[in-house]
Amino acid sequence: MAGDKIYALLADIVGSENVSNELHTLQGYSCDPTTNPPSLPDYVVIATTVEQIQKLVRLANKERIPIVPAVGMSNNGGLTIPVEGGIVLDLHKMNKIIEINEDIGYAIVEPGVTIGQADAELKKKGYWISLPVGPPGSAGLLPGYILHGYGHLGGKFGINSEQITGMEVVLPDGELAKLGGCAVSPYWFHRTPVPDLMGLILGWQGSTGIVTKLGINIYPRPRFKAMVGWGIFTTHEEPLPESCARFLIKLGRADLTYDISGHTWGAVQIGRGLKYPLSPKPEEEPELYFSATTYAFTEEELEVKKKIIENLVKEGISSGLPIATTDVTERAKVEMPTKYALKYSDHRGGGGLDYIGSITPVINWTQGIKRLNEVFDKYGFTSYIRLSIYRGTLQGMMRAIMPYNRGDENDVEAVRKMARETVQVILDCGGLIYKAPSFACEEMWKRGDPNFLKLLKKVKQTLDPNRIMNPGRLGL
């Protein structure tokens, strides 16, 4: 049988202990916590070397078999579900931190390095990186960088992909290439001034190559942390007045914070560990909770930063904004990496967690949160929305989070509809979807420059003419 032939060829490359076509294994790689429909791969393969990946990609080309890169299936968004079958290539055993260069300020990691592993090793040397927010420490670090994810230092340094300094990638023909300055220099310190080809990989969801090494900026780790909290006391129907959005922009422009984040009341209750169904929001509690986090290398520096932030909040209150300070003493004790995703997936029971995340102008959060509340209300769900301002302060993450019961078909169908309506809200607000499932990409392309879509297809066809790399992604 053809399947037996392929199995034997795969086993020749990685060893029989690292390949499986048994149903119970395939099922584990057929889905994730989102509502994206499951799809069985034909094989699961675990690679441990770059050379193995090259051989696997060449085999996939020869046999016209799809190949989907994954890191232990720890990434949400349905992006590693093998929609056309084929091989799921699990890279979690390639988990070495190859270099931490303190003199130049970067680290080089393999794709299987976890969030917790990277943080622990860097902490020993007094450094840190912008860690993906939400996933547990056991989740892969690399996906949150190459898919434009958000990190806990995003208010100071921007989205995670902006921290990438270089990469090594296996291209769809099996060739190995370095991208960024490391293609010329022995050091992985910057992606320019050479032609920046990382755009052929970043955000492409594994459809143009497999990243085998990633260079990331590292920063000295401050010893001291402070957090200032405030609530926005408005109504569910008009949750974020434009005046409050402009206050957030002003606070971000002060350039004192590493993170400015907000949550709807319902999202805060999940963070507190409360389960579905939630009681109605008490009138005395805010519609939105916000906090600003800053760090410093000395207590004196921290005190100055915290005081300025507190004074800005006081100015907002005295100017008549509907805000008041909130106690964030306990929350300030929480350190990265967090386990928020686990709390969300357990909120309604059944382990389901879907979301649509975006980068959206902060000034348009006013209409965005209002309309997202309407979507949640329409389907009988509590509004769970997270907000974070990126470096530059004028745009940031607006993400609708949808915990659901995977065993409840009504829940599943409701969340699928909510996700699609959420995409429309975000696009109406001028936002862009990150980690976008195919249906969200299709909606973006409908509104976009048709020649941009033509170029995407041309790049994909040029790099991957046999269409083996994670086919069915990006609405292409």
Regions found by a protein language model. Give the residues of each.
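Glycine-rich, histidine-containing beta strand-loop boundary motifs that form or position
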Residues: 69-73, 91, 111, 131-135, ...
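C-terminal substrate-recognition/cap domain of FAD-linked oxidoreductases
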Residues: 231-421, 435-440
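FAD-binding subdomain of flavoenzyme oxidoreductases
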Residues: 97-100, 109-111, 115-246
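Glycine-rich N-terminal segment of FAD-binding domains in flavoprotein oxidoreductases
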Residues: 23-26, 30-94
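Conserved oxyanion/phosphate-binding beta-strand-loop segments in alpha/beta enzyme cores
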Residues: 9-31
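Activity-critical C-terminal alpha-helical subdomain
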Residues: 435-476
